[in-house]
């Protein structure tokens, strides 16, 4: 059994660690509220853009945007993968990467090549490590990411799709469900799924200048950017929620460990005192 001094040192070390995990838990709890507000604020814009895209796509009968055309053969698949920049978020990032690799294997089985654009330090490090073809990367977006920070990497994948270098593009991120649940999501980004640009009726009364096709050409890119931006906000909220839960679990485990060590320390101290008393009694009897 370890000595009393070693046990007290261990208790002190665990207590210091608990202070850190509690602080991180409180910081994440504060940040998650702001992240949820930003996420909810951006949703109406994304939904309005989706509706406009549907109207424009059906209004333009003589023009079909490349983003709406499904290609017969898929030779190369692109992924925009969103992760956090920092760790200490439980299995948030690793679970996403593991599920993505599961999604990629069927494509590789057909002979399709894979291109990846990463958003976030953890995704960048992971795909470099496993030697996947990375064609773009952006990191350190912070807790309040802006669309302008994402335009460059989004353009890389959009241009590749328009030029025919990539035949399909997926958006991979953690969707925020609630504080306790974050779901790994794989959304087809390009070409836009039929449900994204088809509506059930034609009773809108929009007037397009100069025409629906010209407007569609400009709006499509903005729509793709809004989808990626919304996914980034979802991932930020998921990150803070996962970190808050992970740090709470760490604090709880620290409390249990401190209790166990305190019990061991008390037993060691009791044994030492009992031994001293026995030695004194034995010495007195000898006299």
Curated annotation (Swiss-Prot):
GO terms for cellular component: plasma membrane; proton-transporting ATP synthase complex. GO terms for biological process: proton motive force-driven plasma membrane ATP synthesis. One of its GO terms (molecular function) is proton-transporting ATP synthase activity, rotational mechanism. It is found in: Cell inner membrane. It is a peripheral membrane protein. Keywords: ATP synthesis, Cell inner membrane, Cell membrane, CF(1), Hydrogen ion transport, Ion transport, Membrane, Transport. The keyword Cell inner membrane applies. Pfam families: ATP-synt. Belongs to the ATPase gamma chain family. F-type ATPases have 2 components, CF(1) - the catalytic core - and CF(0) - the membrane proton channel. CF(1) has five subunits: alpha(3), beta(3), gamma(1), delta(1), epsilon(1). CF(0) has three main subunits: a, b and c. PANTHER family: ATP SYNTHASE GAMMA CHAIN, ATP SYNTHASE SUBUNIT GAMMA, MITOCHONDRIAL. Produces ATP from ADP in the presence of a proton gradient across the membrane. The gamma chain is believed to be important in regulating ATPase activity and the flow of protons through the CF(0) complex. This is ATP synthase gamma chain. It comes from Xanthomonas oryzae pv. oryzae (strain KACC10331 / KXO85).
